[in-house]
């Protein structure tokens, strides 16, 4: 396939059946959003919000874009802004993985960190301050209708098209901004009303399951953390407040069930998914899958259950997800090394290496002149 821009590659991600982890007789499918160009579902929303703002005239040519992000939205925006020529500033709580900061800066964005104690509400308010102070355009991902609309138009339609005439018994997703939850569930209600919509959230932070309203200010927007929020292991999944988009899904009675997920179980699921099915995804993905597999235990035989896998595992290398992965050889790997006699760290060479001998080398005059011309001004690596 040929594309005229990286932006044309967003969406149309694969739907893949699990072969080992699902219960017998139930079909568990995963929507692998890591196949988006920047590796996450947020690429869809980033492109949609920018293009919607361009059409409405809210975003002017060359204007700086600002957004609060746990990482993936910012990375998607960085791709879009790089291609379209908008400067980007993101605010991010210091608790999110360093990989995300580096990716953002590599893509040309500026990253303003906020104290971890201020949580998601803090980084959002910081972005609002910066937008007001400097006249920047804030995409407002937690309340932007374009966020939900793109999933209504694309993500849900892709899933339904892949199944054709086959029924989808349940669709399972976590929630961050709520855009995926709201957009897909609306489309499912219209086109496949028999599909159960399952929301997954951390068992120690049941901001939906508790049934307690989100504190809101006079403007109706979230005002501070939800009283049932607690820190959890799933970065980018279930923030400390119920967003406007998630609240809309609740108010419209689009969510049929809520499944609570244990953080340790999600971590274990990550390793199982990688080593048994070959998927390399992040904690938000495996937490959602853990919820889907739990729900699948009571699903009827032959049911099709779809779980969203929002991003790639590469965003989590410095997090507890990889805390038990050794950088050095394990005992088993050392034993494998010792099972043959050579190329070992503990082996003494049987004979000394042959001394290097000078050999006449023919000099390429053009190459020599090139090196002479650039060596004072450019880094040159010689092999």
Model-flagged regions — what are they?
Residues 1-63, 337-338:
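Positively charged, low-complexity intrinsically disordered leader regions
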Residues 9-12, 124, 134-135, 190-283, ...:
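Active-site/ligand-binding loops adjacent to catalytic centers
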Residues 14, 30, 42, 65, ...:
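Buried hydrophobic positions in well-ordered alpha/beta secondary-structure cores of metabolic enzymes
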């Amino acid at each position: 396939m040929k594309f005229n821009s990286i932006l044309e590659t967003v969406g149309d991600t694969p739907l893949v059946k699990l072969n080992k982890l699902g219960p017998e007789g139930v079909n568990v499918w995963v929507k692998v959003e890591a196949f988006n160009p920047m590796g996450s579902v947020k690429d869809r929303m980033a492109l949609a919000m920018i293009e919607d703002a361009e059409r409405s005239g809210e975003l002017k040519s060359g204007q700086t874009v600002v957004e609060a992000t746990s990482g993936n939205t910012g990375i998607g925006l960085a791709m879009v802004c790089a291609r379209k020529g908008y400067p980007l500033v993101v605010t991010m709580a210091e608790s999110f993985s360093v990989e995300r900061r580096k990716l953002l800066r590599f893509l040309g964005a500026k990253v303003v960190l906020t104290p971890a104690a201020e949580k998601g509400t803090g980084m959002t308010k910081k972005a609002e301050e910066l937008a007001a102070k400097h006249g920047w355009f804030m995409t407002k991902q937690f309340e932007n209708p374009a966020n939900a609309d793109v999933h209504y138009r694309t993500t849900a339609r892709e899933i339904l098209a892949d199944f054709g005439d086959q029924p989808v018994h349940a669709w399972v997703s976590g929630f961050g901004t709520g855009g995926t939850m709201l957009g897909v569930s609306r489309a499912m209600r219209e086109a496949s009303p028999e599909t159960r919509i399952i929301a997954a959230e951390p068992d120690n932070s049941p901001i939906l399951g508790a049934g307690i309203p989100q504190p809101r200010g006079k403007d109706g927007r979230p005002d501070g953390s939800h009283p049932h929020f607690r820190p959890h292991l799933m970065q980018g999944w279930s923030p400390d407040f119920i967003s406007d988009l998630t609240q809309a899904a609740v108010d419209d009675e689009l969510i049929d069930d809520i499944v609570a997920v244990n953080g340790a179980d999600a971590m274990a699921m990550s390793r199982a998914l990688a080593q048994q099915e070959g998927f390399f995804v992040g904690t938000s993905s495996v937490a959602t899958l853990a919820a889907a597999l739990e729900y699948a235990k009571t699903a009827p035989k032959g049911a099709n259950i779809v779980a969203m896998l929002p991003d790639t595992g590469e965003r989590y290398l410095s997090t507890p997800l990889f805390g038990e992965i050794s950088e050095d050889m394990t005992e088993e790997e050392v034993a494998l090394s010792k099972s043959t006699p050579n190329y070992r760290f503990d082996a003494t060479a049987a004979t000394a290496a042959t001394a290097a001998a000078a050999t006449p080398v023919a000099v390429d005059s053009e190459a020599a002149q090139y090196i002479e011309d650039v060596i004072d001004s450019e880094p040159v690596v010689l092999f």
